[in-house]
């Protein structure tokens, strides 16, 4: 069932030092640690410009996954709060691969779940494919998104202005915490997926790298609810977050497959270097091409 307690703590410390980056070539990006625990205010699953100013905003901070089987729940996420990490889902991680797209494998007893994160080029869209590789019977999977909706250089805290409502759309819901932001469309390709509205603030997420640098590193994040669905062995479901709605959720699978097939594998130093270099070439909405000095500060 993943690592032993001592080994998992060693793995956690090492993994929190390793960060991943994927860009959309338009100034937007996904960046977090390889265990999906944000350690910087610049981290998030969707950080993107929302207008012509080129300023990037953290829209989607994270997505927490919970596996439910035989009446037991196993939260696969990892967050830092004052004095502790909770939940401690890193202990279920058995493998991480970066090519062709960041992929994490979890083992919970006899259940093995694979998560593939795909940031789409030339479109503000994140797709995550979950595949149940092994299981004695069907499992329930819950996906809970956490939102920030703030400038990437700032932090957000619980407030009465944030709109915690979710509006139903085909295949999911749309959310918008503040009226001057675009809608964020959350959809899946699972016909039987249900979104359970449960708006709530979660308090005091800590970003260790910010605190180490002498900056404020505490943030509150809002969740509007969670998706719940059933997965059978060898079945997959794809979660999509985008500032543009997908009219037909059944097309999500094909979109994911097409985008993934276009990714080149990073098999040697040269291919890794080429891949990394392309991350910093940006084409703005007005057609300008730029080379960024670096992510995340100059994105």
What residues fall within each predicted segment?
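Acidic/polar, glycine-enriched structural segments that form the non-catalytic walls/loops
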Residues: 123-125, 135-299
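An extended acidic
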Residues: 12-102, 184-192, 247-249, 253-260
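Short strand-coil-strand connectors
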Residues: 70, 107-111, 135
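Short acidic-hydrophobic surface loop/beta-edge motif
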Residues: 65-67, 102-107, 167, 229
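Single conserved hydrophobic/aromatic residue that forms the stacking wall/gate
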Residues: 1-7, 11
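Extended, loop-rich substrate-binding clefts of extracytoplasmic carbohydrate-active enzymes
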Residues: 78-121, 202-208
């Amino acid at each position: 069932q993943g690592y032993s307690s001592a080994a998992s703590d060693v793995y956690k410390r090492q993994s929190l030092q390793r960060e991943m980056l994927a860009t959309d070539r338009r100034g937007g990006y996904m960046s977090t640690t390889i265990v999906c625990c944000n350690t910087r205010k610049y981290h998030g699953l969707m950080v993107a410009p929302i207008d012509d100013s080129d300023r990037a905003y953290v829209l989607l901070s994270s997505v927490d996954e919970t596996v439910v089987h035989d009446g037991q729940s196993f939260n696969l996420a990892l967050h830092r709060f004052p004095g502790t990490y909770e939940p401690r889902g890193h202990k279920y991680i058995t493998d991480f691969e970066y090519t062709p797209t960041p992929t994490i494998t979890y083992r919970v007893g006899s259940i093995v779940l694979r998560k593939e994160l795909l940031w789409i080029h030339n479109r503000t869209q994140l797709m995550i494919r979950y595949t149940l590789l092994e299981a004695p019977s069907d499992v329930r999977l819950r996906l809970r998104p956490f939102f920030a909706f703030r400038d990437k250089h700032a932090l957000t805290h619980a407030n009465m202005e944030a709109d915690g409502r979710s509006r139903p759309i085909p295949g999911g819901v749309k959310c918008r915490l503040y009226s001057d932001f675009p809608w964020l469309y959350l959809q899946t390709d699972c016909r039987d997926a249900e979104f359970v509205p449960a708006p709530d603030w979660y308090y005091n997420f800590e970003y260790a790298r910010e605190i180490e640098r002498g900056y404020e590193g505490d943030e509150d994040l809002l969740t509007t609810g969670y998706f719940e669905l059933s997965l059978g062995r060898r079945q997959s479901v794809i979660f999509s977050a985008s500032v543009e709605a997908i009219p037909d959720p059944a097309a999500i699978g094909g979109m994911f497959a097409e985008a993934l097939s276009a990714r080149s594998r990073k098999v040697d130093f040269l291919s890794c270097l080429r891949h990394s270099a392309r991350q910093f070439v940006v084409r703005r909405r007005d057609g300008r091409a730029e080379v960024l000095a670096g992510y995340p500060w100059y994105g």
